[in-house]
Regions:
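Tubulin/FtsZ superfamily GTPase core signature
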Residues: 1-199
């Protein structure tokens, strides 16, 4: 029912194969979500042109596209990290992005969203954005929300007027979400996006 197409754009495999896979998924009536990385601008104009062409082709074949911009990720990555660690970090962001969406309709979720609602929110939604945050202690909800809203993945976008916001809260088994935390997060998101949004 749902297909995630994850690819690094700019090379032959991700740029060439991902639109074909996504097109097949759409033809099979699957909700099709692309989660892609685009390389740093230091990789040169020819590579970036290939990226732009690939993103455009893939965009036309999916319902929603999440873009992980490596230039923006540099704001949170230690420049002294090895390239192997940087790639592992970016891959981890891709994994968490897919998990965040898939867990919303998971049968293990405390508040489960019907798949029809997810489809309604994401079908033909175009470019989508994701913020990821975490927190511990008495201010964990506020800290996690602040991190998520300041995530480089959001790229300083203005989300007032957004139609849908999907919210996935994950807590430890012994420390479930409290009513106060739940209400704080949802009310804060309404203020951030405008009160016409569907959460």
């Amino acid at each position: 029912e749902i297909v995630f197409v994850s690819a690094g754009m700019g090379g032959g495999t991700g740029t060439g194969a991902s639109p074909i896979i996504a097109k097949i998924a759409k033809e099979l009536n699957a909700l099709t979500v692309a989660v892609v990385t685009i390389p740093e601008s230091t990789e040169g104009l020819l590579r970036l042109k290939s990226v732009a062409d690939g993103v455009t082709k893939l965009y036309n074949c999916v319902d929603a596209m999440l873009i992980v911009n490596c230039d923006m990720m540099m704001n949170v990555i230690d420049p002294n990290w090895t390239m192997e660690r940087v790639r592992a970090y970016v891959d981890g962001v891709l994994v968490r992005s897919v998990q965040a969406v898939s867990q919303i309709v998971s049968r293990y979720a405390e508040i489960q969203l019907d798949f029809a609602d997810l489809r309604n929110a994401m079908t033909n939604s175009g470019i989508s954005y994701i913020g990821i945050g975490s927190g511990t202690g008495p201010n964990r909800a506020k800290d996690a929300l602040t991190q998520a809203l300041n995530s480089p993945l959001l790229r300083n976008q203005d989300f007032r007027g957004a139609r849908y916001v999907l919210v996935n809260m994950t807590f430890g088994a012994k420390h479930g979400v409290t009513l106060r935390e739940h209400d704080f997060i949802l009310k804060s998101l309404c203020q951030y996006t405008g009160y016409n949004v569907v959460l």
